[in-house]
Amino acid sequence: MKVLLLEDVAKLGKKGEIKEVSDGYARNYLIPKNLAAEATGGYIKHIEESKKIEDKKKENLRKRSEEILEKLKGTKIEIKAKAGEKGKLFGAVTAQDISEKIEELLDEKFDRTWFDEKVNIKELGTHTLKVKLPQGVRGEIKVEIKPEN
């Protein structure tokens, strides 16, 4: 029996794949637990169309992420913060602060969770941060922390 997997199933396949399984396995385990549905002709066409639409959305999101990264590479991100005489900040510059500054500069949404590592900058100067945008687009941005006057 051909089934369409509705969830990832260990040792069988990933969500959205069509697999050939025994009738008993499908009727007694996969279908009752909503892990799969019987793959009929119309249902398969519907799923394939949905998958094409989803793939287009993912591709558009990947392109958008690459555009944002290119804009960031050409943009000087400068944040002012209160600092002591030796260059230590009073407090820290966080991912949220940098995200807000990027949104202000680019007029684009930039989520603080897109930073690869935890951001907690406590010194003046230029810092290189790794970012991971949606669809696996990775890159680095430079942020310059300057003292407030």
UniProtKB/Swiss-Prot annotation:
Keyword check for Repeat: no
Pfam hit, one: Ribosomal_L9_C
Q: Signal peptide position in this chain?
A: none
A single GO CC term, please?
ribonucleoprotein complex
State the family it belongs to: Belongs to the bacterial ribosomal protein bL9 family.
Summarize the protein's role: Binds to the 23S rRNA.
Q: What is this protein called?
A: Large ribosomal subunit protein bL9
Q: What is the lineage of its organism?
A: Bacteria, Thermotogati, Thermotogota, Thermotogae, Petrotogales
